[in-house]
């Protein structure tokens, strides 16, 4: 077994970045303090205006992966979470994909899937600036899947194959060992563009949408990360939303809402939260700096479940 130690420097800060409000993509990075309620504050800017840039963190550094800037862009950039400021170039992704999912441990960041529809898994060593490397493949190509992790296992759920119905399959990988994903269980939702977050034992997936209507949903479900099996209903978000993100500590998940349906006709500035250990509906947390969407998976924190010890 492996022992994990909580780092008192981890304050519960969540960061999220990029997004779209007609007619522009944005570079804004926002931050919140997850243990308290309140509105998001300005942190700095990404190196590009972007949407759909997945985020990973080792507790000190947050890295955003390849993104959409009007076309696919393989840029990755990073910030130091305790220090406000603009992002710095980290390296390049293996491809110019967007609408990817991501999760991380205390050392390694994982990005998977993407648009154009892809089955690629790639990884970075978060503490070391450089380009992403091939990790393996997910079971089938998909975009707009959501991810979360414990210190050892990464979980991905949902997504859309490009044409046809959304996926209900949940898959997992062992973060420290390169290789392909394996089947974990089934989602209750079968949604794309969900948000995912976790503590060290319980994973939360929420929201999302289905084709062809692109009408958001408000469902929250959970999995026990160490035990393969199907997701279980947890409760409901305060609003139907998709293409949004989630940030967590060991006790709480905050959702920063994105788009509401049908067909992306509304952009939200709201945030809500749940207590991970207690099933139930979400409660209002505060507001984003302004209303925008199309930033699936772009949130992470200095205290998420992939860091262990919570």
Please tell me what each predicted stretch does.
Residues 1-310:
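Polar, enzyme-active/binding microenvironments
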């Amino acid at each position: 077994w492996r022992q994990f130690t909580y780092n008192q420097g981890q304050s519960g800060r969540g960061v999220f970045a990029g997004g779209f409000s007609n007619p522009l993509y944005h570079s804004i990075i926002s931050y919140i303090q997850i243990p308290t309620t309140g509105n998001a504050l300005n942190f700095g800017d990404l190196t590009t205006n972007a949407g759909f840039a997945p985020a990973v963190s080792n507790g000190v550094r947050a890295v955003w992966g390849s993104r959409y800037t009007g076309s696919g862009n393989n840029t990755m950039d990073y910030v130091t979470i305790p220090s406000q400021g603009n992002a710095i170039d980290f390296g390049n992704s293996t491809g110019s994909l967007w609408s990817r999912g991501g999760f991380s441990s205390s050392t390694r960041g994982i990005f998977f899937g993407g648009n154009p529809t892809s089955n690629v898994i790639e990884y970075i060593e978060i503490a070391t600036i450089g380009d992403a490397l091939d990790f393996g493949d997910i079971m089938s190509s998909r975009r707009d899947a959501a991810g979360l992790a414990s210190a050892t296992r990464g979980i991905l759920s949902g997504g859309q194959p490009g044409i046809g119905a959304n996926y209900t399959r949940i898959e997992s990988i062992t973060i420290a060992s390169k290789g392909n994903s394996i089947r974990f269980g089934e989602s209750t939702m079968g949604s794309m563009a969900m948000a995912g977050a976790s503590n060290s034992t319980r994973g939360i997936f929420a929201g999302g949408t289905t084709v062809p209507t692109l009408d958001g949903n408000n469902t929250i479900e959970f999995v026990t990360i160490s035990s393969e099996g199907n997701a279980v209903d947890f409760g409901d978000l305060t609003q139907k939303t998709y293409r949004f993100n989630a940030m967590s500590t060991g006790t709480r998940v905050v959702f920063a809402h994105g788009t509401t349906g049908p067909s992306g006709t509304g952009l939200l500035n709201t945030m809500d939260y749940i207590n991970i250990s207690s099933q139930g509906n979400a409660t209002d947390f505060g507001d984003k700096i302004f209303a925008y969407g199309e930033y699936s998976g772009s949130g992470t924190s200095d205290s998420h479940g992939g860091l262990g010890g919570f």
